[in-house]
């Protein structure tokens, strides 16, 4: 990428980030509310041992949070410790985390140079599908990680948990890295699979025959 193109991309990226951040900041609550069924389904799929009593979006001390209330659906054993059916807890995480994926992914896509309108439009559609995938592996895992962390802190401190490890990965920079990686893959596909225009296929050049002397 040439320096002039790089500067143009950086400027467009700043403008795209400002615009998408403003839009999603206004739509934070309805956006996260719309994702609640996805979050609930993911929690049920990843942790069938829990019964989800409630998964809500709430305001707490001026911040919007996603709150999960679960209890054990049956008697369970965790690292040799018996946990009775009905034992539960409530955890929460910031709803604003859900905004990072669409803001980063869409901003990079909208700012990237060299994409025509058609490819950029298809890219936005694909980006929205990727956002759903990223969302399914963010807040639900944050909430489950908090649940597992709280349980392990009581019954088996220091024990490893996949949900806790993923939660820490997201908090340690993974939440920003995932949409950037998704944007890179999507842009690579859009660039390498550019649709050919009809009527512009390359044709072999035919040189006129020289007259015999």
Feature-to-residue mapping (PLM):
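Alpha-helical transmembrane segments and their helix-start/interface "positive-inside/aromatic belt" motifs
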Residues: 3-18, 118-129
């Amino acid at each position: 990428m040439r320096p002039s193109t790089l500067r143009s991309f950086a400027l467009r990226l700043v403008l795209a980030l400002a615009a998408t951040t403003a839009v999603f900041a206004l739509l934070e609550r309805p956006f996260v509310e719309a994702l609640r069924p996805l979050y609930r389904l993911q929690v049920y799929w990843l942790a069938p041992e829990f019964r989800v009593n409630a998964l809500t979006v709430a305001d707490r001390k001026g911040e919007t949070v996603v709150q999960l209330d679960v209890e054990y659906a049956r008697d369970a054993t965790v690292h040799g410790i018996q946990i009775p059916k009905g034992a539960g807890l409530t955890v929460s995480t910031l709803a604003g985390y859900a905004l990072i994926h669409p803001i980063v992914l869409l901003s990079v896509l909208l700012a990237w140079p060299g994409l025509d309108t058609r490819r950029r439009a298809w890219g936005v559609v694909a980006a929205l599908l990727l956002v759903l995938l990223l969302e399914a592996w963010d807040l639900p895992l944050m909430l489950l990680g908090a649940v597992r962390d709280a349980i392990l802190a009581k019954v088996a401190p220091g024990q490893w948990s996949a949900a806790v490890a993923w939660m820490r990965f997201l908090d340690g920079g993974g939440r920003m890295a995932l949409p950037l990686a998704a944007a890179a893959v999507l842009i690579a596909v859009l660039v390498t699979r550019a649709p050919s225009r009809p009527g512009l296929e390359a044709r072999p050049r035919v040189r006129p025959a020289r007259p015999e002397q």
